[in-house]
Amino acid sequence: MKLPQLLLILLFVVLADSVQPKRCFSNVAGYCRKRCRLVEISEMGCLHGKYCCVNELENKRHKKDTVVEQPMEPRDKSKVQDYMVLPTITYYTITI
């Protein structure tokens, strides 16, 4: 009697595990599948020869906008600017 009960419990555990595909690793918002759907792209590989399928439309919505750096304003030429004198080495001198 315990064997059929154990088999029944294991059957439900296996079915519940395979209902939703596994998530991709490395912080990629996708699912591991054998074939990607039409609106999905393959980002990287998953285990057991599957692809990490990411929905293109969702991925574009969640991408963060990049911050554009402002160009530097030209300096006022009336201000004094520091400069640096580099040392030089003389290898030989020519006398005329």
From Swiss-Prot:
Residues 1-21 form the signal peptide. Its main location: secreted. It is found in: Secreted. The keyword NADP does not apply. Keywords: Antibiotic, Antimicrobial, Defensin, Disulfide bond, Secreted, Signal. InterPro entries: Beta-defensin, Beta_defensin_dom. Pfam families: Defensin_beta_2. GO terms for cellular component: extracellular region. One of its GO terms (biological process) is innate immune response. Disulfide bonds join C24-C52, C32-C46, C36-C53. Has antibacterial activity. Belongs to the beta-defensin family. This is Beta-defensin 20. It comes from Rattus norvegicus. The gene is Defb20.
